[in-house]
């Protein structure tokens, strides 16, 4: 009966990243963010250490712009520079999406959605970023917030990864 249906499980990760070491007691965890009614996240859940390591490696090696970051330990990254190129690519992509928007297609779902995604999510992933090392922030953000964060870094800056959690949306 369900053979012809394609189910997509809508899970992704939230990464806590800071320029300061993060105490374990301040790690992002499954109870940090608002969930359920009124929140973006249906629910959040912890992941085990092996999955966490794989997710961090995936973030650095396949999601973040190539060469901009280097994994130097299980919990630390080095920012190598490259934000100017990322910003140029970002602006070019937003312009491309904006040029595709016309009076004829502006009310169609895809054209405005893709432009909005290009603006808010330059990495084009479902990963979110929690940029608070103290664990007090009540929200995580899409990749534009991470891009803004990186704009304030100097090459060679060490970044610390705290909690990494799964979320369902």
Placement of each model-derived feature along the sequence:
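Acidic, proline/glycine-rich low-complexity IDRs
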Residues: 4-10, 127-169
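Residue-level signal for the start and early helices of compact helical domains
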Residues: 6-8, 31, 60, 77, ...
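Short, well-ordered helical secondary-structure segments
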Residues: 2-4, 96, 118, 140
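Low-complexity, serine/threonine/proline-enriched polar segments
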Residues: 35-135
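Short, extreme N-terminal segment that most often corresponds to the first beta-strand
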Residues: 2-43, 159-169
């Amino acid at each position: 009966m369900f053979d012809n249906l394609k189910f997509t499980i809508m899970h992704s990760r939230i990464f806590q990243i800071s320029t300061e070491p993060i105490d374990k007691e301040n790690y992002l965890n499954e109870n940090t963010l608002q969930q359920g009614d009124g929140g973006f996240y249906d629910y959040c859940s912890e992941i085990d250490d092996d999955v966490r390591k794989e997710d961090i490696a995936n973030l650095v090696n396949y999601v973040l712009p190539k060469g901009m970051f280097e994994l130097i330990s299980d919990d630390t990254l080095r920012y190598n520079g490259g934000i100017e190129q990322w910003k140029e690519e970002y602006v070019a992509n937003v312009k491309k999406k904006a040029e595709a928007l016309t009076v004829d297609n502006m009310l169609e779902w895809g054209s405005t959605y893709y432009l909005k995604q290009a603006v808010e999510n330059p990495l084009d992933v479902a990963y979110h970023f929690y940029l608070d090392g103290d664990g007090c922030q009540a929200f995580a953000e899409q990749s534009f917030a991470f891009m803004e964060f990186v704009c304030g870094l100097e090459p060679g800056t060490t970044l610390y990864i705290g909690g990494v959690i799964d979320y369902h949306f």
